């Protein structure tokens, strides 16, 4: 599931301050940004706040956005920077327990119990990843960005993106195996676009 780019006319109008055009952009990207942030921070309320802050920063920075890069690349770069700022601030505060059990797993509604348990186990394994691995994996598998877009968004090389996604998937698979969770192997195309 790749994210589409906003219509250039809508983007240009939003850059000139057209509130309707900006609302169109927010509606198109609010859910993917929120889902990404939620999986990184593990707290629905904080994810909602951060998503709003991301779009405030996007609104403020939109007049300076140039079409040299894709809008989604820039949007997730803004998102990454805001989340990293928040994670650094959280590190300086007394520790609080983040529990993935409070987060409804994607696609778990109306699924058999075993499938829901497997999804929960996957998200627990993802939650245990380092922030760098988690960001790359979520941008690819949840948001649907290409490897190139991830490299641009995270400001890292394409090789680093490939390694982080490979390593993240390897660590998730190892965690699932340790927990005795059987997950069917799905052949993945070697697409790096």
Q: Language model features by range: what are they?
A:
Residues 80, 84, 88, 133, ...:
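DNA-recognition helix of helix-turn-helix
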Residues 3-7, 85, 93-119, 146, ...:
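Internal acidic/polar
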Residues 2-3, 13, 95-98, 123-124, ...:
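C-terminal edge and immediately downstream basic/flexible tail or linker adjoining helix-turn-helix-like DNA-binding
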